[in-house]
Amino acid sequence: MKFNIRKLTENDWDTLVSWWDAWPSWVNPPKDFLPDNGTGGLIIEKNNIPIVAGFLYFTNSAAVLLEWIISNPKYKEKDRKEAIETLIKSAEIFCKNNNKKYMFSIGRNKSLINIHKKLNWSIDEKASYEITKQI
């Protein structure tokens, strides 16, 4: 069975919140912190089961940020890693189709970093920090 790749909708929000709440080190971001008020991204499903999602921050440059990749903590099938790879590759295609040339992401999860490496992303081995402020 192949994966279904689609854009996020308002109906996905409660699912995403439940995933963020289930992962102990994650924080649920406010909707208005995310692109298009929580709908600016992609989700990967299999047999109508959502597996992984990520958000695409389009900029006024040739770059797009791929952020807030979150997965279904209850999905334990062997193709979980493949679903994450599909999300990233689909995001790349989506960005290319929108005339973007660069993608940028921030991460600390080793498994996710390794998937990016496998997909030929450049990884800066020096630690960096997300710095935010509500103004």
Q: Residues of each region from the PLM?
A:
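Conserved acetyl-CoA binding element of GNAT-fold acetyltransferases
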Residues: 62-79, 129
